[in-house]
Amino acid sequence: MRMENIYEYIARLQSEGKWQESFGVIRAGLKDNYNDYELYFALGEYYLKDNIDKAYLCYENALFYCDNKDDRAYISGVMSEISSCGIKVKPLSIVIVSYNSKDVMKACIKSIRINNISSSYEIVVVDNASTDGVTEWLESQNDITLIKNQDNKGFGAACNQGIKASSPDYDIFLLNNDTVVSPNAIFWMRMGLYENDRVGATSCMSNNGGFQNITEVFDSVSEYIYYATKNNIPEYYPYENKVWLAGFAVIIKRDVLDQIGLLDLRYGKG
């Protein structure tokens, strides 16, 4: 007699209404294999009963990791069906301020591209009159909207320029250029953003995020990335409510931004 595989086991648990048990199995599976698209699809099934937006994001992440043509078509069909029911999820406009530091910027952009499905975001970079060649590199990238300032406008003003240049129906992700986006980091930030209607913005943990620091210390970027693959997984209580967030990586709902307006330039630091 053939043994049940993990996906069949999860499906059986869900069909029997054992949702929390299925969540635990999905969590354990993603801790071992962070890019298993079938587990993200199963996670979407878990959320579908309570939160269609989070379910959609899970299916989108499943599509990103899926390398099977037939399964990709099936996942896309599920996403289209959910979209027709009315979802609030918006793509991201990733706004980055640039001032020199070409290699740092290249690493940041690369980390966005390799860890996120291209249909889920756009990149807007505002360059504050750099002189080290980063402007020319940015100009050569066909997936970046570039705003070139003739002088250094400062961080806040440049962020506002980027927000104004973003697609009007996209959520805004303000991201420092010295960040490296780890696997599933943006996915889980967006999951938090659509936890409920009361959430207006989300941020994340970092090795250098002030009060949002992780406690572990490693010697290389690759070690931090590995740490992220083991920790950017489903959790029962993954989010903390905050009245303010560290500014190195913040996603703001478009609806909220439309209500509160652009960054207040009286406050100089991000």
Which role fits each region the language model picked out?
Residues 120-129, 147-149:
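Short beta-strand/loop segment that forms part of the nucleotide-sugar
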Residues 149-166:
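Glycine-rich, basic loop-to-helix element that forms the pyrophosphate-binding segment
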Residues 208, 227-255:
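A recurrent flexible, glycine/aromatic-enriched loop bordering the glycosyltransferase active site
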